[in-house]
Amino acid sequence: MLHVLWTFWILVAMTDLSRKGCSAQASLSCDAAGVCDGRSRSFTSIPSGLTAAMKSLDLSNNKITSIGHGDLRGCVNLRALILQSSGINTIEEDAFSSLSKLEYLDLSDNHLSNLSSSWFRPLSSLKYLNLLGNPYRILGETPLFLNLTHLQTLRVGNVATFSGIRRTDFAGLTSLDELEIKALSLQNYEPGSLQSIQSIHHLTFHLSQSDFLLGVFEDTLSSVGYLELRDANLDSFYFSELSTDEMNSPMKKLAFQNADLTDESFNELLKLLRYTPELLEVEFDDCTLNGVGDFQPSESDVVRELGKVETLIIRRLHIPRFYSFYDLSTVYTLLEKVKRITVENSKVFLVPCLFSQHLKSLEFLDLSENLMVEEYLKNAACEGSWPSLQTLILRQNRLKSIERTGKILLTLKNLTALDISRNSFQSMPDSCQWPGKMRFLNLSSTGIQAVKMCIPQTLEVLDVSNNNLISFSLFLPLLRELYISRNKLHTLPDASLFPVLLVMKIRENAISTFSKDQLSSFPKLVSLEAGGNHFICSCELLSFTLEHPALVQVLAGWPDSYLCDSPSRLRGQRVQDARPSVLECHQTLLVSGVCCALVLLILLIGGLCHHFHGLWYLRMMWAWLQAKRKPKKAPCRDICYDAFVSYSEQDSYWVENLMVQQLENSEPPFKLCLHKRDFVPGKWIIDNIIDSIEKSHKTLFVLSENFVRSEWCKYELDFSHFRLFDENNDAGILVLLEPIEKKAIPQRFCKLRKIMNTKTYLEWPLDEGQQEVFWVNLRTAIKS
């Protein structure tokens, strides 16, 4: 037993710690303006540490069961407090005592079963109060709202338990913009309960029992401008005379939402209208008519009193026995002066011709989302029907032919605006007939693929949005507004087609760019909405947006709706913020710069080659490649000469008459290779030089000023230099025929200059006594 108790205690402790941990982790998020968000944070109590800096506090969707007297003490500057769906069942008497500046309080959908006037006594600045969805039966034991003199919006009641409304419940309230009372379980309504409120702009009353309708209606006749009755079952409603003689009601609009009616109860409701001489609009939303349209208003004065009603709106009317529905002939006279009729999404497929002819004052007719086809439309638009009609809306019906629809409507002489959008036309003929005064035409979402001359030339507003158009080339001289969004256009239409165009909406097409010329070609354009297209953020587009801010001001939605689609690195960025690379924006300048740089580089390389003998190195490379095809060292049988003699033609006398005689006639004789004598006729001279040097044991250079200036001597010196460099030997012999400076030998012949710097060279003596020694030394050098 002790073990069980111990285990239970541990579980309880862990649960408690878990709750505390969750509470500790939850926190408010507040911005600099003092707006604090604590929605859905699993708070079990009002968070601590609330300060005077808070202006708005939202703690909806939490688990706060109670509000203590000190929980909100620090919020002295709070303007809005939202506690919707927070599980609150208890509020202490002075919980709101510090909230004198509070203007907005939402306590809806909690568990408050008893309301206390002390909660609201300090809230002298309150403008909005929502008490819907709490399980109270009545609005407190004492009047709740005596001190709420600034209250503008009040919502009270619930679905299940709110059962009584008393005369004192709304005491202290003199004027409200909006009052909503949800009393679907109402069992008691004291007459005069709403009379204390002198003015209510909009009263919404959820009332399921029709027994209290007359009492509510009578109490609000002198104060309510717009009465909306919701969720009412009026099948058994019966009108009995009102006790009031009030005939100057300010009521302008009467609406029924989610109400059930019968033919008989509709007749009874008409009797209420004699008390609302200023009534202009009657509306039925989501109602059910449990009848067949056999309306038989019995009093002639009803017809007279209905004369000021200008607007009748019927939306989503459900008629279970619509197949037995009458032709409405009994109410023709009721609607003769009505100017605006909307019958939307109510399965209307036919309007009798006679009914249309009785609607002599009708200027606006909306039959959207019904079942009209051309055949029955022709019956509705018969000759003499709707003589004053200016606007006709047939959106989302079953129309198939634009041509036939236009022809049917020729009977409507005053028609200026036609909406036939969301019908399945698919195609457009080349020509059509339309009423002569047409100014507005809506063909959006009809599947058309091209715009042709079928469109009337009198149009000032045209909507062809959400179709399959790839171009627009129709001339419309009077067009002021063009709506062509969600198509497949790749460019703006030609401005010459619309000389007076003011507004164009061309969102979500395939437009990639536009230019100054395009926009400036629309002389009167004040608004162009082109966001949502696939813009290529090219340099031209960006330059246009930066350089022409006045034209950019025409772009509606700029800059947030204009995003780059390409290049990929800019995708998703605003066009205004995109920054392409220099390469993309200055290609011509960049190419010119590169070309100039290349020319300068070539000139620089040429200058360096000239200065550092680059051509010589190229020739050496060529010679090296040629020499590489041959063995580095020729076999002994290939050595044909003891020495190859390189000399200038100006020194030929000394070479041929002195040196050749001394060397070739000596014992043993030397075999010399001379270019005059031994070069192979017809062979390329450079090949002769290379072969002669390679077939010679030594290369003998007769250096003189003439040698340095000789071009062919330089070639021979070049290839000899290559051999010295490549084979790393001492095959070169220098003979100075006359004194010459070492620097006269080009710097590039580093090997030969090294020889002159490190080895003794032979110098031809002018003294005849020393010349014999010279020949001996020369023979020795050749033999080595």
From Swiss-Prot:
State the disulfide connectivity.
Answer: C30-C36, C353-C382, C432-C454
Instruction: Establish whether keyword 4Fe-4S is in the entry.
Output: no
Tell me the first and last residues of the signal peptide.
Answer: 1-24
Tell me how the protein is altered or processed after translation.
Ubiquitinated at Lys-754 by PPP1R11, leading to its degradation. Deubiquitinated by USP2.
Question: Site annotation (Interaction with bacterial lipopeptide): which residues?
Answer: F349
Does this entry carry the keyword DNA damage?
A: no
Keywords attached to this Swiss-Prot or TrEMBL record, sorted alphabetically, are:
Cytoplasmic vesicle, Disulfide bond, Glycoprotein, Immunity, Inflammatory response, Innate immunity, Isopeptide bond, Leucine-rich repeat, Membrane, NAD, Receptor, Repeat, Signal, Transmembrane, Transmembrane helix, Ubl conjugation
Where in the numbering of this chain does the TIR domain appear?
639-782
Q: Which residues are glycosylated?
A: N114, N147, N414, N442
Q: Name one GO molecular function term.
A: transmembrane signaling receptor activity
Matches recorded under Gene3D superfamilies: Ribonuclease Inhibitor (3.80.10.10), Toll/interleukin-1 receptor homology (TIR) domain (3.40.50.10140)
Which residue ranges run through the membrane?
Answer: 589-609
ATG16L1-binding motif (motif): residue ranges: 761-778
Stretches of the chain forming a coiled coil according to its record: none
Fetch the Pfam families from UniProt: LRR_1, LRR_8, LRRCT, TIR
InterPro entries in the record, alphabetically?
Cys-rich_flank_reg_C, Leu-rich_rpt, Leu-rich_rpt_typical-subtyp, LRR_dom_sf, TIR_dom, Toll-like_receptor, Toll_tir_struct_dom_sf
The LRR repeats are found at 54-77, 78-101, 102-125, 126-150, 151-175, 176-199, 200-223, 224-250, 251-278, 279-308, 309-337, 338-361, 362-388, 389-414, 415-437, 438-457, 458-478, 479-500, 501-524
The record gives the membrane topology as: Single-pass type I membrane protein
Q: Which residues lie on this side of the membrane: Cytoplasmic?
A: 610-784
One GO CC annotation:
plasma membrane
Residue intervals of the LRRCT domain: 525-579
Q: Which family does it belong to?
A: Belongs to the Toll-like receptor family.
- Comment field on protein domains: Ester-bound lipid substrates are bound through a crevice formed between the LRR 11 and LRR 12.
- Name the job this protein performs: Cooperates with LY96 to mediate the innate immune response to bacterial lipoproteins and other microbial cell wall components. Cooperates with TLR1 or TLR6 to mediate the innate immune response to bacterial lipoproteins or lipopeptides. Acts via MYD88 and TRAF6, leading to NF-kappa-B activation, cytokine secretion and the inflammatory response. May also promote apoptosis in response to lipoproteins.
Assembly state and interactors? Interacts with LY96, TLR1 and TLR6 (via extracellular domain). TLR2 seems to exist in heterodimers with either TLR1 or TLR6 before stimulation by the ligand. The heterodimers form bigger oligomers in response to their corresponding ligands as well as further heterotypic associations with other receptors such as CD14 and/or CD36. Binds MYD88 (via TIR domain). Interacts with TICAM1. Interacts with CNPY3. Interacts with ATG16L1. Interacts with PPP1R11. Interacts with TICAM2. Interacts with TIRAP.
The name of this protein is Toll-like receptor 2
